[in-house]
Amino acid sequence: MDDKQAMHAMSIDDAYHVERTLARGPSGVTELVSIDGNGPFVRKKIPSPLAQRNVWAALSACQSNRLPRVEATYELPDRFVIVYDYVPGSTLAQIAEENGRLAPNVAVQLIDQICEAVQELHQHGVIHRDITPANVIVAQDGAHLIDFGIARIRSEASNRSRDTTALGTYGFASPEQYGFAKTDARSDVFSLGRLLEFMLTGVYPDASDYEQRLADDAAVPARLRAVIGYACAFEPSKRPQSVQEFRQALFSQSNPPIPNASSANPPSTRTTNGSASASRLFRRLH
């Protein structure tokens, strides 16, 4: 970057008014900003060596309103900057903390909306790898998927047989993300299954008795338990092979195949209490 380019980028950067800082850490700074009376927007400043420019370029091409709409990208001397639309709402983690488990019809509606976002990402070659309650915003128009900090572009040409760095949120990350295999679309399918399970139970998937509690939970329809088991099979080949297949299983009237082996997690005891009715959550959605 020459001096002229740097000055131009800094003039763009200075045009934004910072409303408040949303997050700050080794991976960069996230701010709520406005410009010329427009906004608010989210602005992320990522250290240049950590910037996944190809992921953000792919996201810019996505059309789903369940994904952030990228407004601008530019380069500072030591930062890659992305500006995208801000979606007001509550995360699924916050909703579960406040209300507990969701009614099955509400959980299915939300997971299908998240599937729409993930399916669009996959069509543009992006694997999200961090589909969690904290990374789903529920706004007036439904669910939105956020946080692309560990997303990557799927590389069919790569010679690697497995991921070399363990990344993801424990309990929601697929086994591949811990070095068992190479992540692909089926890794996000695993996370979608875990997320559906969380919405239906209000229990984080790192409890020692998590799977047994799901199996014994009469409030969760047996067909949805089967869908979750299918999506969360340890072996990627035993899962739905795409988000589209997962959605088909979700709405099918017949039970999906049950894998011989499920995934397992070490202990934790994080739970939420209570049950949110469909009408209560739909007031959030509409």
Show the residue positions of the predicted features.
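Conserved short submotifs of the Hanks-type protein kinase catalytic core
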Residues: 77-91, 95
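Conserved HRD-motif arginine in the catalytic loop of eukaryotic-like protein kinases
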Residues: 239
